């Protein structure tokens, strides 16, 4: 027991604060899988935020940055009126962001990918120019009449007030219907399939050149990094609703993340759709995602 206490002093758990106003990094947790279930996905992503953070807490700490977390999902309301719950959550996120004068990095942990919609809706209150970088096997632009984890980017595109670009990386034709691929109403959408990414980076060896061409830096633009865990190859990511047998390699995903941080000055990061129920006993998926979060929490990216 004494060894555990001593070791925790050198782990990230020691930098956690219960006072969110003191946090340099804030995790907004969405511990619900209602949107995934409405999209006919497998139950279990509601456990993802805690499963991922439990791994993060044990990682060695090499800076003095404070972090905190807050739970915002309201599964009870979601089960009664999902549309109303999304509007309510967008307001909650907006109020949370407005109150965080000190925080420089925000990490949004789902839950289903439906949570990117209220997140962007809230961010739209602070900016009229945004680029979303979505790493995913699916476009998540379904034309379903009722919202779910497969519809968020079509919802975002139809409601965004301003200049919006959605860059989709790692998409598979076999995972997206013709209607899903139909044009978005009020946003520019750039789609780079798995094949486009693979050949554009020369088998993932020239990622920086590819990213500089596809996602050039634009001034006065808010960048949002959004990762659906099923974008990652199944060898490292089994714990998802739809396992990707031809997914992106970890190094590429990390390169995109680092490019977003270093070159695009990104402050908003979403990680969605991880399902610990279907992960293996080694928590391989949670450890993979925690490694990405560890990069976000590195102090070399803070001013």
Predicted segments with their positions:
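Conserved alpha-helical scaffold segments that buttress catalytic/binding sites
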Residues: 2-303
């Amino acid at each position: 027991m004494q060894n555990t206490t001593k070791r925790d002093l050198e782990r990230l758990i020691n930098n956690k604060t219960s006072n969110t106003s003191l946090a340099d990094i804030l995790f907004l947790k969405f511990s619900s899988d209602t949107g995934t279930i409405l999209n006919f996905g497998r139950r279990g992503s509601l456990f993802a935020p805690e499963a991922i953070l439990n791994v993060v807490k044990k990682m060695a700490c090499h800076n003095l940055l404070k972090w905190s977390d807050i739970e915002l999902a309201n599964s009870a309301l979601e089960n009664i009126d999902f549309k109303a719950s999304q509007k309510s959550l967008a307001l909650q996120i907006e109020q949370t962001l407005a109150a965080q004068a000190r925080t420089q990095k925000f990490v949004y942990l789902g839950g289903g990918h439906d949570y990117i919609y209220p997140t962007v809706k809230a961010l739209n209150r602070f900016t009229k120019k945004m680029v979303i970088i979505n790493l995913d096997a699916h476009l998540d632009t379904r034309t379903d009449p009722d919202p779910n984890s497969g519809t968020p980017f079509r919802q975002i595109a139809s409601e965004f007030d301003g200049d919006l670009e959605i860059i989709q990386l790692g998409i598979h034709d076999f995972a997206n219907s013709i209607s899903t691929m139909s044009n978005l109403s009020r946003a520019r959408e750039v789609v780079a399939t798995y094949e486009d990414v693979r050949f554009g980076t020369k088998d993932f060896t020239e990622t920086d050149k590819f990213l500089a061409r596809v996602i050039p830096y634009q001034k006065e633009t808010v960048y949002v990094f959004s990762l659906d865990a099923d974008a990652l190859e199944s060898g490292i990511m089994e714990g998802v609703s739809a396992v990707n047998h031809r997914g992106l390699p970890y190094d590429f995903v990390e390169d995109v993340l680092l490019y977003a941080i270093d070159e695009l000055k990104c402050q908003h990061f979403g990680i969605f759709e991880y399902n610990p129920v279907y992960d293996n006993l080694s928590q391989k998926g949670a450890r993979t995602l925690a490694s990405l979060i560890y990069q976000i929490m590195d102090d070399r990216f803070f001013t």
